[in-house]
Amino acid sequence: QRQMCIRDRGMHVTYLDPSGSQIGKKESIPDTARVLGRMFDGIEYRGYGQEIVEELAKYAGVPVWNGLTNEFHPTQMIADMLTIREHLGELKGVKFVYMGDARYNMGNSLMVTCAKLGMHFVACTNPKYYPNKELVDYCKDVAAQTGATITLTDDVAEATKDADVIYTDVWVSMGEPEEVWAERINDLKPYQVNTKAFENAKDSAIFMHCLPAFHDLKTTIGKQVYEKFGLSELEVTDEVFEGPRSVVFDEAENRMHSIKAIMKATLSD
């Protein structure tokens, strides 16, 4: 999708995969950043540690875009907020419920974004999966200035009452040990987004997911989960995913528009 966005804007793209890059191995991140900054007009990093993309940005001398790290996913946030505006008309005051594992890039980024935009963010999950306290405290400080609220709860009925948006992300990833899958699935089963989760939400409430989603048996992971745990759906049911509240494909399209806008804004004189 990113390569398509670049080409659509009349630019040229070079892709460096992990096996083709010596970043942080044979060559330090500051050195790599300065070399790439002499060769390219912009750099997108999609990888692991947040500190890597921040160090690239410090030394590159050209725009550096965070395509995703373990901690944050800012380009997805622009797409998500655009999608909410398209369907609900405004952002400020929106009650946004995130169900599932809220410890990583999506939970973190959505909480920060909601805090900055005056939205009411609710992380609804097993307390083991709450965002880290330091980030929660930061978001509460921001929320005090914007009129936002930050709530952490394990009560689905309370969390989803009058919700405008219910959002989730995958619980498991390829390559993780089976025992990790088992623990996470067991802990997060009560926080599956299903029709019951929408019973207390507003009639206009929408369902969002950054994709990919495990809502049926048409994927390798979906089949593996069914064989090992007997579940045909994970973080969201097929009924919700394919239902009238779901805006996930508008959301996916909006990543393209958002990435183009970010590139134009940061590369323009």
Language-model region placement:
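Rossmann-like adenosine-cofactor binding region
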Residues: 141-237
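Short, small-residue-biased leader/transition segments that mark boundaries at the very start
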Residues: 1-6
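A glycine-rich phosphate/pyrophosphate-binding beta-strand-loop-alpha-helix module
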Residues: 9-46, 50
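Rossmann-like dinucleotide/phosphate-binding beta-alpha-beta segment
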Residues: 93-153
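Short, structured coil segments at secondary-structure junctions
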Residues: 9, 39, 59-61, 117, ...
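Anion-binding alpha/beta catalytic cores of soluble intermediary-metabolism enzymes, centered on
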Residues: 41-113, 209
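Short, acidic/turn-prone active-site loops that include or flank metal/cofactor-
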Residues: 19-21, 68-72, 126-129, 252-253
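C-terminal helix-to-coil terminal segments
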Residues: 224-269
